[in-house]
């Protein structure tokens, strides 16, 4: 029962990895540059990118849960759609998706619209999911 975490080296991702490891989960971390990944020895580090289909297929092999944390970038929506389609293809049972508070209300804001679009895609695909809608992260302002 392996959990794949994308964005594992980011502010949120590092904390997710730490908490899952502390709870005894089998964690696989998707990173672009393994030399920059400093995780406990029990974490399996796989190199890949959310726009690299082959690396995602490899990373998702044998995974039961995908914790989808993708950065706020221009192709964020595309990254998520690729990941979701590959997760379905890989037979992943559960998606945990980090969205944003009020994504359904502020769809006129591009970032919110993208997050809400991903939420709708998860629903449309019939994937088992937990969608997290946190408020703003103040920690992101100091990094």
What would you call each of these model-derived segments?
Residues 48:
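Cofactor-binding loops of NAD(P)H-dependent oxidoreductases
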Residues 69:
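Short, basic, glycine/proline-bearing loop/turn elements
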Residues 1-41, 51-63, 72-75, 81, ...:
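Oxidoreductase cofactor-interface core, primarily capturing Rossmann-like NAD(P)-dependent enzymes
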